Amino acid sequence: MSRGLLNKAYEPHEAEEKWYQYWMDHDYFHAQDASEKTQFSIVIPPPNVTGMLHMGHALNNALQDIMIRFKRMQGYNALWMPGTDHAGIATQNVVEQELAKEGLTRHDLGREKFIERVWQWKENYGGVIINQLKRLGCSCDWSRERFTMDEGLSRAVREVFVRLYHDGLIYQGDYIVNWCPRCHTAISDLEVEYKEEPGFLWNIRYPFVDGSGDIIVATTRPETMLGDTAVAVNPNDPRYIDKVGKEVILPIVNKRIPIIADDYVTMDFGSGAVKITPASDPNDFAIAGRHHLEIIKIMDGSAVINENGGIYQGQDRYICRKNIVKDLEKQGYLISTEPYTHNIGQCYRCKTDVEPAVSKQWFIKIQPLAKAANAAVVKGKTRIVPTMWEATYFEWMSNIRDWCISRQIWWGHRIPVWTCENCSQVIVSSTDPDHCTGCQGSSLRQEEDVLDTWFSSALWPFSTLGWPDQTEALKTFYPTSLLVTGFDILFFWVARMMMMGIYVMKDVPFRDVFLHALVRDEQGDKMSKSKGNIIDPLKMIDQYGADAFRFTLAAFTAQGRDVRMSEERIEGYKYFVNKIWNATKFSVMNLEDYPETDQVGIRKDEESLPDRWIKVRLNKTVHEVISGLDEYRFNDACGSLYQFIWHEFCDWYLELIKPVLYSRDHPARRQAAQHTLLEVLKTSLKLLHPFMPFLTEEIWQKIVPDGTSIMVSPFPAADARFEDPDTEKQMELIMDIITRIRNIRGEINLAPSKKLKVLVSAPNKALAAILDEGRDYIVNLANLEEITIGVNLEEPKGSAVGVVGSVRVYVFMEGLIDIASEKARLEKEMNKIAKDLSIVSKKLANRDFMARAAEAIIKKEEDKYKDLRDKHVVLEAAMKKLEQTVKS
């Protein structure tokens, strides 16, 4: 058979570049807008245009590519929609940093010129992550690549905003929002990360105006007292019932503020009395609304004290805090200071402490949208996998707050709202108006703010398919089939896509949502530059190849568990790649004389037991891989493939058929083995292709030289004809006997080259006959000089015994080893291990060590203990075997 020879070793970089270009040239990634095939579609979670490929991207996109290649091979009209996100604040920050190197700010350029500069930056650097995804092997339909600031997507954004506004779901109002003093913009609740930090609780005396004493107020933020407008107590607190309605003097500021009663106040926090600062706390803001309190802003957009701060004007908030505490102490208002640990909200982009601030913002009235999105999951229209995330989704949707969608930056979708400067008429339009609809004047001023980046991302499943136009792509691929994303953006993105998809399209945006976990280091720690534990995906691809890297990511993706990654694990699967390559080389060499067409008539009676067995095992593997992928159990699918290819195909089947392949005595039997070998190899490659696309294409083109790509060949399907439990049991028994003989050889330290004499005793004739069929396999793979198989045979003297179910295996020991010297060797080794075990167990029993040592060190010692204990068990078994031999 004229099949191409394989190189000595697999060269991943050469193969990756060659085959990716080949797939692109043949348009294999393209999906048809109109097709008779069933559609399967995925929209990519668009990476930031500023982004570089990190481990989270690598995992997310490897899983998507596995699914899209799998479904494409199953015959679906499979679309993987690619694109990037404009990433408002992140991108603006990057470009502002570039300007700073030139000694410029965005204000020096002005809005229009600055936006031009961002577009220029996007054109120069925005495609980096796309090229990196291609290196990973991602088979997106690149002809459809979208960007969230594309003209078409911008049109969709405006259209949805206008619809929401006219439906009464968008409003503008003064509200307390999370303000980032570094990014100079409001951010949503979801964009705030909370970090537990040590701080202080200051107890401050507020004297009554009438001189009748004072009330003690506890606060973690004394600088905000500059904006206090009341002191609040619980209406049911007996300590303060007669104090409600009185006035106190606000220290430092020296103005009168009232004592009010509100149910929000908890009686057991501090003294039970709290200061109310409406402009600096969302709860205080709500209380101020109920009690009609004045709202006094004390900070500017950079968290610097403004003109309302009196002598503290111009001070940073934390410097102001120190100065106010000093002044309170000096003036006799500070009663005490206590250590206090509390959660500090930080901007998830720049890690600056967020400042609650009152400002005029645009909001979406979210409850009506959330209700429909919640119901869709309850009714099963969208399935969340793993299901454990459903409870989190429901809880969040039930307690959702209105979404602040305006951002005080320049890069992004500018809010499509105009105000007439003549008559103050507000115009909300999906197109730029040229005149006022009220007074017909032409002097219009557009809203300065842009929309939250997540607003455009929420429209991604339908805007990328051409909406608001009713395109063929939209009709074919919406709702999409699957969304693969990290659980950390379930609320940022998934929930919002659900709400917008149902609102705009009247249907869910996807049928399934698979939420994968985070990629952590081997110890389970988050990867970070400061810890020095970051793994660079591109370096891993350079060093080990994309196939080994992809397979590692999938193999460690177990539902509900973080992906623990290390370079050693990736290297381990590089060995798997090498194993497949070497097995293929062996196969190709032994298929050289196989007929050009493999459609030869193979008689069933010429098929050997290993031929029948490997087909049964392959059929089970097909079922397990399909089941694993259909249920997003990527680790199970990988585990089945690894077990079958490495252990069953390479370690067993190839070894079992070598005598048949090397011999010319039985041509029909040899051809049957060749036929099975080729079919199993081809099917295995197809199963493996979604995980290892480059390796499988390289091999496929050598063994199936008809010019077709493996990526468009049919995916295997399980076949009931190959379900044969009897064959499986028979082969497993023979394999277990071979393994037991090998173990005995190892236990008594016999060289693999030393031929053995073995007696195998079965409990009945039927089982003896089955074993007799496997006689040659046992002789060859256990390296036997002689084997006797019978029923209820007597145990020979001087033999080592092994038990396999109801079968006894006796290995003759006479003349093979010096029992005395072997016993001495074992005793010496066991004593050494016992000594090491004692040292490690004492260390693990030491409370000081367990309390002070790092988790990784403790784990290392525990692993060492287990390894030593396992070795001791093996040596004990070998010693018993020797003693058994002496007795018999």
Task: Identify the residue ranges that each predicted region occupies.
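Non-catalytic terminal extensions that flank enzyme cores
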Residues: 1-55, 78, 335, 348, ...
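Residue patterns forming the tRNA-binding/recognition surfaces of aminoacyl-tRNA synthetases
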Residues: 4, 9, 18, 22-26, ...
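N-terminal catalytic cores of NTP/NDP-binding nucleotidyl/phosphoryl-transfer enzymes
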Residues: 34-95, 148, 157, 218-220, ...
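Short, solvent-exposed turn/loop segments enriched in Gly/Ser/Thr/Pro and often Arg
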Residues: 35-37, 45-46, 79-92, 145-153, ...
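Alpha-helical support elements that line or immediately flank enzyme active sites
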Residues: 57-59, 282-287, 496-504, 641
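Secondary-structure transition/capping motifs at alpha-helix termini
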Residues: 69-77, 98-111, 131, 135-140, ...
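Feature 926 captures the class I aminoacyl-tRNA synthetase adenylation module centered on the KMSKS loop
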Residues: 203, 395, 399-455, 459, ...
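Catalytic alpha/beta core of large soluble enzyme barrels
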Residues: 222-302, 329, 370, 798
